[in-house]
Amino acid sequence: MQVKLKVLLIGSGGRESAIAFYLRKSVLLSELKVFPGNGGFPDQELLPPDSFQVLDKNSVQSFLKQNPFDLIVVGPEDPLVAGFADWAAELNIPVFGPDSFCAQVEGSKDFAKSLMTEAKIPTAEYKTFSEYSDSLKYLESKSIPIVIKADGLAAGKGVTVATSKEMAQTALKEIFKDKKFGSSGNQVVIEEFMEGQEASIFAISDGDSYFLLPAAQDHKRAFDGDQGPNTGGMGAYCPAPVISESILQKVKEQIFDPMFDLFRKKGHPYRGLLYAGLMISPNGEPKVVEFNCRFGDPETQCVLAMLDGDLLELLYRASTGKIKGVQAAVKKGAAVVVVLAAQGYPDFYEKNIPLNLPETSGQNVHLFHAGTLKKDGKVFSSGGRILGIVAQGADLKSSVDQAYSFLEKIQAPKTFYRKDIGYRAL
């Protein structure tokens, strides 16, 4: 490809820091702008904080008319569910990310489950409720453990794996009565508990063709040994050995092929990234836990470390309908990301923690900012997940060792991290 591209990246997390890091390496990049960004981005890449409102169509379109871009890469799910890709398409600007119809696959658990039923995609049995009393009645007839999910977006925290009836009842009360997730809890999906190992697989699609990135395994629970509350993710590694070649074939044939076919049939070819969160049963059968309409975080940070090629070219081709025949070259070895989080995360957590960060240059380690901000040249925490430390090496053990030895050099009071990331594959 002989084009030079001015790119706008939307988002502020570790995922966006990683995407930006690999976009900068592209020979196709003429200029990168980021909105709203975080404390790790160079000032010249950041748009002013009042540039536009990312969930407001008029605001977005008026900004884009005055500031044209060749490609927009949308990191988080909220703008996609709101219609960001549709708004940019009206101005003929390519977007890496699906339209608002397709983005409902993450925006509504009920929508996703109904699509899976229609496409005969393997997933847990479920029922959707809009009335508290009906959900409680249904719960009585079910065995434990059972999974309670708020229907709408809840930043990865709307799911409870209930190990007792009381826990399930509390989860339903919090969603329906206490409005813990606001309108995202107007409906609740109750589904059967699935046994097995989880894995994440990302597919990049141009609406017609698609290819898969290497599988990763995320660690959702806050504490070592998979204890504690669910979080947005405390670390991940890639590739995930639980996904063998034969399982990968099943994932393509039973999950991605029928899903992309169904979107085309509905008149909405899926352009962008479709993330399948999978449960692999003990006998090697993949089932879908959830779909997301964007790169996962933190998995993206280690998956992109394994890509051997031009990320910008891949994203631009996907956004302009030109990925037929393209394959993502993958490095040998393994990569890991470990998340440094604020004490108290995922509930009420410390903020404004001063961060003293060592240099990473000359090492196979990258430090990706997430919940950080810059004040007077110094970096402070601003979110629950503060940093992602990524290492890529000859094998998982060497990558894990590098990541943890770097983490020990970071001076940040009132923070914590899991010390067992990758344990299932070590």
Curated annotation (Swiss-Prot):
The UniProt record gives the binding positions of ATP as 139-200
Q: Which reaction does it catalyse?
A: 5-phospho-beta-D-ribosylamine + glycine + ATP = N(1)-(5-phospho-beta-D-ribosyl)glycinamide + ADP + phosphate + H(+)
Cofactor(s), by name = Mg(2+); Mn(2+)
* Example of a GO biological process term: 'de novo' IMP biosynthetic process
The EC class name is: ligase
Annotated NCBIfam families? purD (TIGR00877)
Record-given protein name: Phosphoribosylamine--glycine ligase
